[in-house]
Amino acid sequence: MTTIVNVHAREVLDSRGNPTVEVEVILASGTTGRAIVPSGASTGQFEAVELRDGDKQRYLGKGVLTAVRNVNEVIAEAVVGMDATEQVEVDQAMLALDGTPNKSKLGANAILGVSLATARAAAAELGIPLYRHVGGLTARTLPVPMMNIINGGKHADNNVDMQEFMIFPAGAPSFAESLRMGTEVFHALKSVLKSKGYNTAVGDEGGFAPDLKSNEEAILVILEAIEKAGYKPGQDVFLCMDVASSELFQDGKYVLAGEGNKVLSTEQLIDLWDSWTRQYPIVSIEDGVAEDEWEAWVELTRRIGDRVQLVGDDFFVTNTERLARGIGMNAANAILVKVNQIGTLTETLEAVALAHRNGYSSVMSHRSGETEDTTIADLAVALNCGQIKTGAPSRTDRVAKYNQLLRIEEELGDAAIFAGTSVIRGRKQG
């Protein structure tokens, strides 16, 4: 009864009011799996192609009717009759149908929607949670949330250059407690910002988006908020950053527009990260140098990789070829996992497996354009990532994932393992 009998896509909206693709996969038993595809604002140039219509008269050119049509008329014909529990076969059939290296023919948004909906349908038919269906019996590690509480860069209309300043409540004993700690710091930050006369409106990912005196001030106000909430920085709650430095990279230099167009060389930027990670409890930096600066990644990793998690997002784009090259060069030590960067569940699993086999960490991640879909919460547990990035504890599109993780932790009961400080590099355990 796990045979796919119908596949249907429609155009729906994401958290930014932009169209995206929702797919339903219906099985012979009548069981349905549904998934909605997310979308990013700062996208790596090597990501799989998200198909947009380009009709300026409709949704400012961002419609996805072409991708929807590709699901309903092309992909459906190929996968109807296949077994939904054979995820690899379903994904491979779509990849063969597309035939391009970056999914530009059918669109990664079309292919991913079908891929994730297929997994959901299979799990529902088997009567097991999605994390168990994908990850098997070993899926029981709850991730530490990386909560983006100050938004900058492309995620906010402010003068903060770095895209995300995050808190990482790894000192908690459980996921539920880490979520509580992070949320209390988030509320404390609001009062800290208000006391300084700063705006407390939120950005795309639910974090605050104030204009600050400098990028470093973001760290200082967060440290103040951690203490105000009654926690110890570097013991209970740590800091993480997503620099999204490809967005700052111009003519071989890094330009900090929010600091009066301050220009830094690659060496100066690496010096800055070295300094900040010694001065502050920063345990993870994502995209610390630009996506094409391979030698800079090697140097950054050599300098601070033994004590700081260096995450490749735009650098790796959840792509096994780029990740394998990075591993070979000892560039970075962790991969950010975004299902829509690569475009199928199977390829996502392959990327995480490659990372883990080579001692690289993995961080499951949302996109800035999200929906009520909670698939990534299950995948974080399924793949034992130990870390998840899904925004501030604000906005339903972000909180939906946290609430799903609360359900999973409760369901696992005593079998649940909270990753905690075990994921922090250079930190002695016990």
From Swiss-Prot:
The keyword Transmembrane does not apply. GO terms for biological process: glycolytic process. It catalyses: (2R)-2-phosphoglycerate = phosphoenolpyruvate + H2O. Pathway: Carbohydrate degradation; glycolysis; pyruvate from D-glyceraldehyde 3-phosphate: step 4/5. The active site is at residues 205, 338. Keywords: Cytoplasm, Glycolysis, Lyase, Magnesium, Metal-binding, Secreted. SUPFAM superfamilies: Enolase C-terminal domain-like, Enolase N-terminal domain-like. It is found in: Cytoplasm; Secreted; Cell surface. (2R)-2-phosphoglycerate binds at residues 163, 338, 367-368, 389. SMART domains: Enolase_C (SM01192), Enolase_N (SM01193). Mg(2+) binds at residues 242, 286, 313. GO terms for molecular function: magnesium ion binding; phosphopyruvate hydratase activity. Its cofactor is Mg(2+). NCBIfam families: eno. Belongs to the enolase family. Catalyzes the reversible conversion of 2-phosphoglycerate (2-PG) into phosphoenolpyruvate (PEP). It is essential for the degradation of carbohydrates via glycolysis. This is Enolase. It comes from Symbiobacterium thermophilum (strain DSM 24528 / JCM 14929 / IAM 14863 / T). The gene is eno.
